[in-house]
Amino acid sequence: MVAVARGTLRRTPLYEEHRALGARLVDFAGWEMPVQYAGIKAEHEAVRTRAGLFDVSHMGEVAFRGPDAERALQRLLTRDVSRLGEGQAGYAAVCLESGGTVDDVIAYRRGEGFLVVVNAANREKDLAHFRRHTADLDVEISDETEEWALLALQGPEAERLLQPFVAGDLSALGRYRFLETHVDGGEAIVARTGYTGEDGFEVFLRPAEAPSLWRRLVEAGAAPAGLGARDTLRLEAGMCLYGNELDEETTPLEAGISFAVHLHKEEEFVGQRALQRQRERGLRKKLVGFELEGRGIARHGYPVAVGGERAGVVTSGTMSPTLGRAIGLAYVPPETEGGFEVLIRERPVPARIVPLPFYRRKRNDPEGGASG
């Protein structure tokens, strides 16, 4: 799958498609990836109103096989994967014994085994962590990143555009469910998952088959979209980004993803005791959404002041293309209510805490349809 470019940068199977479309390519986690094509705002709007197509082949895929595959993931992930049925996926965190977050992932149950999608920048770290904590189990852990290309088709028209290429009824596919089927004639996995806050699908297929499907979806009306729009979309949807909202010094409870933490499953997971203590004793910090009430845009790393004292940090911020307001995520002391100030070039700008997500789509998909 992977070719080498500009020193050590890797390229996805769609690199030539990106060049042909005039994409601006950047180094992202060691991959030469498209950050934008027509422009971030236009691509963002296309996903919210029609459908956008992303190349996310840089994401890592790790397969778990063998008699202890499920037990291994019960030990490694915060989610109770024993509850996942065939064709079902689940979002989870991977933790250190301290409770800090190694990564956030999605696990797909495939028969007796699993496919786990990890963040590109964390792939090697994750593999080492997985193997270190399961050395006593009968499980085969394989890096299959180079065996898959991954396309994400997101937006209200995603189902209509993808259905002609899929052997299977997408309208019956619920949120976090997937089909092992044929797409455009080749073997593929089609999942109703995403990272945008819209309905949509992620399609795993063999690298050699990815360019053809990409071109046919673009011809059908999907707008090519880059990592820039992917970031503004996920921020409006209140979704965490590893390296911003999540890191090894931050627990899943602090990051507000406790829905993916199952503290009472039979197999104790790495970091479970630390998270149980934190739940009993209280958080050190909490993640909140905010809107600026003054001029400016909050950016990653800007300080936060509560009661005139520096007490937190902005993790993500942008001018929301959908809402037309400056929004962001920040860590603040757990007792913080109402609002705070963001220091933009040392100038305090009032910010109001608001509920997450900033944007919630109107649902008209089948029961349990994707939130993106």
UniProtKB/Swiss-Prot annotation:
Keywords: Aminotransferase, Transferase
Function: The glycine cleavage system catalyzes the degradation of glycine.
Record-listed E.C. numbers: 2.1.2.10
Subunit structure of this chain's protein: The glycine cleavage system is composed of four proteins: P, T, L and H.
MF (Gene Ontology): aminomethyltransferase activity; transaminase activity
Species of origin: Rubrobacter xylanophilus (strain DSM 9941 / JCM 11954 / NBRC 16129 / PRD-1)
Family matches, as Pfam families: GCV_T, GCV_T_C
Catalytic activity: N(6)-[(R)-S(8)-aminomethyldihydrolipoyl]-L-lysyl-[protein] + (6S)-5,6,7,8-tetrahydrofolate = N(6)-[(R)-dihydrolipoyl]-L-lysyl-[protein] + (6R)-5,10-methylene-5,6,7,8-tetrahydrofolate + NH4(+)
SUPFAM superfamilies (alphabetical): Aminomethyltransferase beta-barrel domain, Folate-binding domain
NCBIfam families noted in UniProt: gcvT, PRK00389.1
Name the UniProt record assigns to this protein: Aminomethyltransferase
Family statement: Belongs to the GcvT family.
InterPro entries named in the record: GCS_T, GCS_T_bac, GCST_C, GCV_T_N, GcvT/YgfZ/DmdA, GcvT/YgfZ_C, TrmE/GcvT_dom1
GO biological process: glycine decarboxylation via glycine cleavage system
Gene Ontology terms: cellular component: cytosol; glycine cleavage complex
